Amino acid sequence: MNNTTRAAIATAAIGALLIPLAGCGNTIASSGKTELTVWSWDASIDRAAKNFMKANPDITVKVSNVGSTEETYTALNNAAQAGNGLPDVTLIEYLAIPQFVHSDTLMDLSKVYDTAKLKDTFTPGTWSSVNINGGVYAMPADSGPMAYFYNKDVFDQAGVSEPPTTWDEFYEDAKKIRATGSYITSDSGDAGLFNAMMWAMGGHAYKLNDDKLTINITKDKGAQRFMNLWQKMRDEDLIDVHTKTWTDDWMKSLGDGSIASLISGAWMANNLLQGVPQATGKFRVALLPTVDGTPINGEYGGSGLAITKKIPDGKLDAAKKFVEYVTTNDEGIDARVSNGSFPATTKTLNQKDFLAKTTLRNADGSDNEFFGGQKYNEVFSQAAKDVTGKWEFLPFEPYARSIYNDNMGPFFSGKETFKAAADKWQKALKLYAEDQGFIIQ
C-alpha cells in the first residue's frame, strides 16, 4: 500500500471536519532558541513542558490544545493532507497509532532512539501498543491497565464480602446485588470497553501484516467469552443497559450506589473523585476478574508522545529531548502523575511512595481518602504487570468505534443477540477495510 493510499485511510477514518491550525509552522524562534510545537488535549503535558523549559532554556515548547482526541486526529490528518501545519510532537492514544502509521504521519522512533534498551522501561501493554510492524511510533506517556472499582457499602449490603476474582463469581455477585435493587455495573454500548474486555479475556481479534488484515471478532475466544457473559447478564437484567456512560445520570447512579461497580482503566480513580465526591470512602479497587483465576489483563485507554515524520532536521534533537523527558524522566513523569495520569514506566509503578499512596488529590490540592485508606496503587501496579502484550488495534480504530453503536445498539435495546450484532459490526468493518485497500484474510 503506497503512502497516498495510506493517507487516504486516515482521511476517511477521521472525517472531513476542518480545524484551523494556528501557530504550527516549522520555525526557529527569532531568539535563536529551538521552538517545538506540541499538540495535547491533556493539560499535564503543558505542566511538564514548563518544567522541561526550565531545565532546557535553549528550547521553547509551545503546547496547543486543538480539541478532543477526535478533533486532534482530524487536525493531524488535515495537516498531513495539506503538507504543512503538523506539530513537531503530538500526544496520541494507543488506539490511534496504527492509523497514523499507515498514513505515514509518524516517525519510527527506533531510528532515533536505542529502543531495544528502552523496552524494559515501560509496561508490557504500553510497549506493545507503540510497536507496529517492527517499528516504534511513540513513547508511552501514560497507561490504563484495567481494574475493578466497586462500592463496598453496596457489596456489604448484598452480602458480598469480597470482590469477585473470576467472571463466574462476578455473575453470581450480580444476582445478589440486583436483589437489593442495584446493578453490579452498566454498559449501554461502549466500543472501548468491548475491545478492552476482549483483550483482558485473552482475545486477539485483529491482526495486520503489511496490507493483509484479519478481523475475527465473532470467532475470537476473548470476544466470545465476553459476549456470552454479557448476553446472559442482559437477559437476566443484571447489568444496566440504559444509563449512558459519562452522563450526569451515570455519575449520579455511581454516587448513590444504583450502579455498584465499574470496569475501567486505572485513570478512572481521579474521574470518580471529581464525578462522585459524595461516594468518598465507599469505593475500593481490585484486580479485574479473570476466566479461571489465572492473572491476565488488558488496557483501557492510555497515550504516548509521537514525533511527526516531517519534523525539520534542526528540531529533531530538541523533540527527542522533550519526549524522553516527559516519558522517562522522574520529574517529567511526576508532573503528569501528580495531576491524575497513570504512569507507563515500570520504575514508577514499583516506587515505594507510589505504592504506599492512600489519598487522591482534590481540585484544591488537599488530600482525599476516596478509597477508604486503601493502598490503591498496589492494585493498579499489579494490574499493569498482568497485561498481556498480545493485542493489536485496527488501522482505522477511531472509525471502527464510531460505528460500534450503529451495529451493537440492537443488542443493548434487547432486539438482537450480542453475537448477531457483533456479526453486523464485523461485516461493516471488513467492507470498510476493503474500501481502503486492505486485503481481508
Label each PLM-derived region with a short phrase.
Residues 174, 212-244, 288:
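Glycine-centered hinge/linker elements that transmit conformational signals in sensory
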Residues 132-141, 146, 168-216, 222-223, ...:
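Extracytoplasmic/periplasmic solute-binding protein
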Residues 65-75, 95, 165-172, 242-256:
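Short helix-initiation/N-cap motifs at beta->coil->alpha
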Residues 78, 86-88, 118-154, 183-184, ...:
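A structural signal for short loop-to-beta-strand junctions that line the ligand-binding cleft
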Residues 268-279, 292-299, 303-402, 440-441:
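C-terminal lobe and pocket-closing loops
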